[in-house]
Every structure is written in structure tokens, then in C-alpha cells.
């Protein structure tokens, strides 16, 4: 090869290498240092930036130490197990505490009024952080979209979660709960009592519910998707415990290969279900499950604007279905599990809830009107959501300079809204903030704390969780039917060890002793 060509190639490679090095230096050093100086100059104190890792290594170390031992005797003072680094940062640096997610600064916002300002997002200055490609393999959909795409998808999906539509899902809720009750009655048998780890049982229950309510007659395929998505979630948890390196997902490691294989299978299953449903709709066969409603309203949206480009594509529908699975299954299963655990810890409240269920339903099938009248059960569920919210924090990012609480946040700063820390804060909940006291919700959510924004387990504002009504209705149905058939207490084998694996879960299971009534 001509020496001039070789020289030109060498110069080109050198220029490319120099550009990569400059970009890496900017991303990993100069930008974090600029952002840190800007924040500290305005009084935001916190952890110093550590090259590349930020607080990751310290987070892993502290969390490993905190989770080594369960909480004995069981109590609701457990924030040190959930996020020991943030707890220490807030204790040392105040409620505007700076921590680091790799080279990205994260400032925690503990003031409910500032949380309200961020979540209301009136001027569009706060966006959701961009999801890493590896996260998108699990789910994107409505929860991750911004701007016009979010508006369009929310408008299409919203009618599927209206009250009248939720009422039609009660038979599916009842069928799944009946199967669970029947299985537990078989386990207890003639012994009258039996130890059961209710955590995997309730995961299966809510997985079955979302399979039936999302896909109806395609239930078997739906359950396979649930199993695959659960495995994808486990792989994601392992991945987020390491520093994110752009392009790493393309390396043919066993886990990367498995992630890609799961994603392809899930997409193929969903595409097959959607195509069958499209063909059925053309024949006039309409379904009332979530997929059917989603496709019906998507078609209406396209017809209203007289353009196929206005509605969702098949890929969009696939992403929304994946999100149904993650959000619909995870959040309700952990809510029901922690509710059983806390009612096992506090039997007087279990008795009060059972008495109310008995007064409203007797031994009859729970119906919508009766579920709506369950005041004590609702108070209990709210208090469980306060102490053990399924999602422990929300995040937003600035994409241009934004004033908040007297501080001008530069672009590309993450704002953490630590739901669980605010839910446990005595400043808003009183000295009994870390005690189980459903009576605080006796007069409703608005009067439960010193600031109404101190309780936001489903988020708040225009992006409040679209499925909160679905989750609460399912939880009321499940809990009511369990209380009708069983009393329960914590097993001696139960270890109280809340920890986070995307959602707040019992680390060692939820072993309960069930007594048939």
C-alpha cells in the first residue's frame, strides 16, 4: 500500500483516538467537576466525585454490610438497609444532599413542596432520565416517554383504566384469587394450619391477574411472557450494580446473549398475540382485556385524526404490553406481601380488617360496591404503601438551567425524589413516623400528614401512575378473600429484611403460618 495512504490512515486513526479520549475525559472528568463546582458554589453539599465510579463502590459496600443481618426484632426502622449511602448523605449534609451515579450528579429533594414542583413540571423543565439500553430490554412504554409521544400514548391508554373498565376486570381478579385460596386450602389440608412463603405465591397471583386482564384468552402465552420478563428483571438487577459502559451490551457475554434472546422471544410472543387480535378485530370480535382496549382506542385515535401515523405502531403496543407486565405484576405483589407481613406483626389490625370484610361481604363474593366501602382495609393499604412503597424513589433530570428551591441546577443533573425517606420523615408524619398506624389515614390522604405531598407512592402530577386504581382494586380483592378464609401470623422462620430489587421486597421471603377459618 502506498506510504501516503498508510500515513493518511494513521493520521485518521490518531485523530479518531484523540477524539474518543477527549470525549471520555469530558464525560468522566471535566463535566462532573464543572457540575460539582456549580452545585457546591450554591450551597449544595454532599459526596465528592470519584473518577468513573462515583459512589457505586461505596454503595455496594455499605449495602452489603447493611443486608448481612435481618432486623430483629422486626421493626419498621429499616432505611439503613434500603439506601445506606443516601441515609448517611442526608444525615451529614442535609436534605439537599449530593451523591453520584457514576459520573452523573444526583441531588436528593426532601422538601415535599419542591417534590410537587418537580412532578407538576408545568414548564417542561424536568425530564425523566434517559433509560440505558439494557433497561429498555425490560420495559419502556408510557413510563419512559416524553413530550408529544407521551401525550399521545397517555391519551390512547387512559380510557382502558377508567372506572367502568376496571369494574369489568373484577371477574378475572376473583378467578385468580379463588385459585390462590384453593391452593392454600389444599396446602393447609386437615392440619388447620400450615407455614407458607406467601411472597412467591402472591407474585404468581399478580402475574396470573395481569396475564388474564391483559390478554384474556391468550392467558397461556401471557404467563410465558411473565416468566421471561421476571428473568429479564433479574439480569437487569445484576447489570445495574456495575458501572455503565457504552457499547458493553454488544459484547457476546453469556448474560448479554441471554438478555437478547429473552427480548426476541418476548417480542415474538407479543407480536403473535397482537396479530391474532388484529385479525379478530377485523372480524368484529372485540375483547375487554387491556390489550383489546388498547388496540380499540388506538384505532379510534387513528381514525379521529385520519392518519395511521397518529396512533401506535405494533412496536409501540409491544412496549406498552411489556410495561403492563412489569408495573402490573411487581407493584401489587409487593403491596399484598407487605400487607400480610404487617398484619401478621399487628394482629389487632388484622382482626379489624377481617371484621370489616365480614360485615360488608359475609362469606359472599366481593363486589365493586363493597370493595369501595372498605374504609379500614383502605387505611391499612395506605399505611403499608407509606412504610413500604413498592418504588422507593423517582428521578428526574434537568436538560437546561432550572431554578428550584433557590438553587439554579445546571443541565444534566439528576434529581432524586426519595419516596420512602419522605414517607418515614418525622417532620411530616410525627414522632410515630416509623410505626404502623393506619388510623393516621382515618380522615383520608389529605389529612394524614403535615403536608399532603408527603405521601406519593404512585407519583404525582400529570405522570401519576395510570394503573393505581387497578392496583388498589386488585389488592382489596386479594386481601378481602384471604381474610375471609384465613387468619395468619409471622412464622418463627421469618426474617424481617426489606431490600430493593427494582421494587421493595422481602429479602428472605415472607413465611407466614396460615390458619383456616
Curated annotation (Swiss-Prot):
Pfam families: p450 (PF00067). SUPFAM superfamilies: Cytochrome P450. One of its GO terms (biological process) is steroid biosynthetic process. The keyword Disulfide bond does not apply. Its main location: membrane. GO terms for cellular component: membrane. Its EC number is 1.14.14.-. One of its GO terms (molecular function) is monooxygenase activity. Pathway: Steroid metabolism; cholesterol metabolism. Heme binds at residue 465. InterPro entries: Cyt_P450, Cyt_P450_CS, Cyt_P450_E_grp-I, Cyt_P450_sf, Cytochrome_P450_Monooxygen. It is a single-pass membrane protein. The chain crosses the membrane at residues 5-25. It is found in: Membrane. Mainly expressed in leaves and, at low levels, in roots, fruits and stems. The keyword Magnesium does not apply. Keywords: Cholesterol metabolism, Heme, Iron, Lipid biosynthesis, Lipid metabolism, Membrane, Metal-binding, Monooxygenase, Oxidoreductase, Steroid biosynthesis, Steroid metabolism, Sterol metabolism, Transmembrane, Transmembrane helix. Belongs to the cytochrome P450 family. PANTHER family: CYTOCHROME P450 72A11-RELATED, CYTOCHROME P450 FAMILY MEMBER. Involved in the biosynthesis of spiroketal steroid and saponin natural products from cholesterol such as diosgenin and analogs (e.g. furostanol and spirostanol), plant defense compounds used as main precursors for the industrial production of steroid hormones. During the 5,6-spiroketalization of cholesterol, may catalyze the 27-monohydroxylation of furostanol-type steroid to an intermediate product that undergoes a stereospecific formation of the terminal heterocycle to yield diosgenin. This is Cytochrome P450 CYP72A616.
Amino acid at each position: 500500500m502506498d506510504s501516503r495512504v498508510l500515513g493518511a490512515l494513521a493520521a485518521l486513526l490518531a485523530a479518531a483516538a484523540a477524539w474518543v479520549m477527549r470525549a471520555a475525559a469530558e464525560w468522566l472528568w471535566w463535566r462532573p467537576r464543572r457540575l460539582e463546582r456549580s452545585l457546591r458554589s450554591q450551597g449544595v453539599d454532599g459526596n465528592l466525585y470519584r473518577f468513573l465510579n462515583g459512589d457505586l463502590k461505596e454503595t455496594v459496600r455499605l449495602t452489603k454490610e447493611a443486608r448481612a443481618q435481618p432486623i430483629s426484632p422486626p421493626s419498621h426502622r429499616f432505611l439503613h438497609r434500603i439506601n445506606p449511602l443516601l441515609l448517611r448523605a442526608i444525615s451529614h449534609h442535609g436534605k439537599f444532599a449530593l451523591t453520584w451515579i457514576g459520573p452523573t450528579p444526583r441531588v436528593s429533594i426532601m422538601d415535599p413542596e419542591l417534590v410537587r414542583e418537580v412532578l407538576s413540571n408545568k414548564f417542561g423543565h424536568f425530564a425523566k432520565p434517559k433509560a440505558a439500553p439494557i433497561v429498555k430490554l425490560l420495559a419502556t412504554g408510557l413510563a419512559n416517554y416524553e413530550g408529544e409521544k407521551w401525550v399521545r400514548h397517555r391519551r390512547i391508554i387512559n380510557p382502558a383504566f377508567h372506572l367502568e373498565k376496571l369494574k369489568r376486570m373484577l371477574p378475572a381478579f376473583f378467578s385468580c384469587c379463588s385459585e390462590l385460596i384453593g391452593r392454600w386450602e389444599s396446602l393447609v389440608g386437615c392440619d388447620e394450619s400450615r407455614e407458607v412463603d406467601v411472597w412467591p405465591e402472591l407474585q404468581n397471583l399478580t402475574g396470573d391477574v395481569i396475564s388474564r386482564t391483559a390478554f384474556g384468552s391468550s392467558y397461556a402465552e401471557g404467563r410465558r411472557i411473565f416468566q421471561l420478563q421476571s428473568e429479564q428483571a433479574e439480569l437487569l438487577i445484576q447489570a445495574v450494580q456495575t458501572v455503565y459502559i457504552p457499547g458493553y451490551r454488544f459484547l457476546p457475554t453469556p448474560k448479554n446473549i441471554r438478555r437478547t434472546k429473552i427480548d426476541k422471544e418476548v417480542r415474538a410472543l407479543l407480536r403473535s398475540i397482537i396479530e391474532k387480535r388484529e385479525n379478530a378485530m377485523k372480524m368484529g370480535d372485540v375483547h375487554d382485556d387491556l390489550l383489546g382496549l388498547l388496540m380499540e382506542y388506538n384505532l379510534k385515535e387513528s381514525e379521529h385524526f385520519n392518519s395511521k401515523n397518529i396512533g401506535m405502531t405494533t412496536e409501540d403496543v409491544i412496549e406498552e404490553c411489556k410495561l403492563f407486565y412489569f408495573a402490573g405484576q411487581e407493584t401489587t405483589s409487593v403491596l399484598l406481601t407487605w400487607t400480610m407481613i404487617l398484619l401478621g406483626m399487628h394482629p389487632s389490625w388484622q382482626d379489624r380488617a377481617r371484621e370489616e370484610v365480614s360485615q360488608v361481604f359475609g362469606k359472599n363474593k366481593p363486589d365493586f360496591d363493597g370493595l369501595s366501602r372498605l374504609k379500614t382495609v383502605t387505611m391499612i393499604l395506605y399505611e403499608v404503601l407509606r412504610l413500604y412503597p413498592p418504588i422507593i424513589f423517582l428521578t428526574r433530570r434537568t436538560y437546561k438551567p432550572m431554578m428550584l428551591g433557590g438553587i439554579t441546577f445546571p443541565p444534566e443533573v439528576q434529581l432524586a425524589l426519595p419516596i420512602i425517606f419522605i414517607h418515614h420523615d418525622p417532620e411530616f408524619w410525627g414522632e410515630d413516623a416509623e410505626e404502623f398506624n393506619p388510623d393516621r389515614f382515618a380522615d383520608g390522604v389529605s389529612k394524614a400528614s403535615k403536608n399532603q405531598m408527603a405521601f406519593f407512592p404512585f407519583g404525582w402530577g400529570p405522570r401519576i401512575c395510570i394503573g393505581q386504581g387497578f392496583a388498589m382494586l386488585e389488592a382489596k380483592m386479594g386481601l378481602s378473600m384471604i381474610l375471609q378464609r384465613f387468619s395468619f401470623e409471622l412464622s418463627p422462620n421469618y426474617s424481617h429484611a426489606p431490600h430493593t430489587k427494582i421494587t421493595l421486597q422481602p429479602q428472605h421471603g415472607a413465611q407466614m403460618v396460615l390458619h383456616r377459618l
